[in-house]
Amino acid sequence: MKYDLSNFYNDLKLKFNKSNGRETLLFLMEEFSKTISLKDERAIIAVGNELASFLRVKGQTDFAYKIYKVIKKLVLDSYGFISKDYASLLINISNCHIVAKNYDLAIDNLNETENILSQLSDTKYLMASVYNNRSQAYRAKNMLDLAQEDIENALKIIENEEKIAVSKINLAEILILKKKYAKALVKVNDAIFYYEKNKLRLPHLANAYATAANIYYNNKEYSTSIYYYEKAIDVFDETVGEGPIKDILIKNLNQAKKQREISWMV
């Protein structure tokens, strides 16, 4: 008996839009268990990737790494080293490295992925992901010119609107570090408009709100910064739930409130 992946993805989309983070995690764990019981390797890989990605967003990288270890062997056995499936998995593992602050490992993985994709055809979507993720690692290492170059390369080849929105958030974060706040705000507002227009309550929307909040904070517009941090926390709480990223958002919100109080006293 084969696992119904089409039904899984439909249910997962509903969970992301209508359920809280705990319910989504339980759903993913239950479905992953079903794929293992059915011994459906294709489904184990697909659902395992979604579960590991969700754990990564929650900051639970140790658990995510364990799942990636399981599915990496299955991917190599099923598709081989020079394959889009393996390249896609390496990109996901690199995301986990970035969350775990293993930036050099992430860059090495993504360079390897780029080499694999150069030997395959029809790889624009995956190559854009390489650029996006490597840009994040470069940004974390303060290699801002390389980070901006990668993200701009991604935007040149992406056609999917949602992926464009993600790339614009990433570009905005680089521009913030370069203190180009006006340009950063244009990029992140484009992303926010896309998510709100399409009623997509996703973790990426929380990231967009937090990025906007950071821009307003740097511009000393503390009330607006607070507004966007609160929106970011609401969306993150709905879609992911508790975790270190939410803790950081709350810390940033409190810092913005403190700075607003100080500004009122001056």
Cite the ranges covered by each PLM segment.
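Alpha-helical segment of the N-proximal tetratricopeptide repeat
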Residues: 6-38, 50-57, 99
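Conserved alpha-helical positions within TPR/SEL1-like repeat arrays
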Residues: 13-17, 46-57, 84-99, 125-140, ...
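Alpha-helical repeat scaffolds
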Residues: 27, 67, 147-151, 183-191, ...
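Short coil/turn linkers that connect adjacent helices within long alpha-helical scaffolds
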Residues: 37-40, 77-81, 119-122, 156-161, ...
